Design a protein with these regions (language model features):
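Extended, charged alpha-beta segments that form solvent-exposed binding/catalytic grooves
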Residues: 2-204
Length: 204
């Protein structure tokens, strides 16, 4: 007598099969090779971090997107990373600690506790490159050009590039500084995520 085990993946979780898996792997290598050619150095951050410090300055936003659980070994709360960019910032600030310009790149899995408004999947592969210690306009242009090159290598057409500035956001938020802390934080997050529905709830 045999029994059939019925199984399914969690909502928003995908797996890659042939030939798609090979296509994704080849693209990952192609992107990293492009970054290496521009003198970016590879880092491999851990997929797990302490919940109390994950995300650094963006802690609240990053943690709100992370799966968290208690570590059976230490009893501390751990989180699965939902983003690698903030990990790169942490590595530059606390591990490398260089006074020189630092250029890092990475590729790895990220897991989010909920799907975004853009992507159905909660598990994705994030590939990126970051420049630290160089506030010049040349560094900004290098980052933008590298991003556009990455999009080109990915075979994505009809791209729209939105460029923001922290000073502009601060100017927009200035009239709402009298809101209580919770409402102001919600407004700031809605602007960051470009969520019209959330904005309408706060600003009729």
């Amino acid at each position: 007598m045999t029994s059939k085990v019925r199984w399914s993946l969690p909502d928003g979780v995908d797996e890659l099969l042939p030939p798609k898996a090979l296509e994704v792997e080849e693209l990952r290598r192609k992107l990293l090779d492009e970054y290496f050619s521009k003198d970016y150095e590879l880092i491999i951050p851990p997929i797990l971090e302490l919940s109390e410090t994950i995300g650094g300055e963006a802690h609240d936003e990053i943690r709100s997107h992370a799966f968290s659980f208690k570590d059976n070994l230490t009893g501390k709360n751990l989180s699965i990373r939902p983003d690698i960019s903030e990990q790169a910032s942490r590595i530059d600030a606390f591990r490398i600690q260089s006074n020189e310009i630092v250029k890092l790149c990475y590729a790895g899995d990220v897991v989010k506790s909920r799907a975004s408004k853009t992507f159905r999947s909660r598990t994705t592969i994030q590939v990126g490159a970051e420049i630290f210690g160089d506030p010049s306009i040349e560094a900004e242009l290098e980052s933008i050009n590298l991003m556009l090159r990455s999009i080109e290598l990915s075979g994505i057409n009809n791209t729209t590039l939105n460029i923001g500035h922290a000073g502009l956001i601060a100017s927009v938020l200035e009239p709402f500084t009298k809101l209580d802390k919770s409402e102001f934080s919600t407004l700031e997050k809605a602007l960051s995520q470009k969520s019209k529905n959330d904005l309408k709830k706060i600003v009729p």
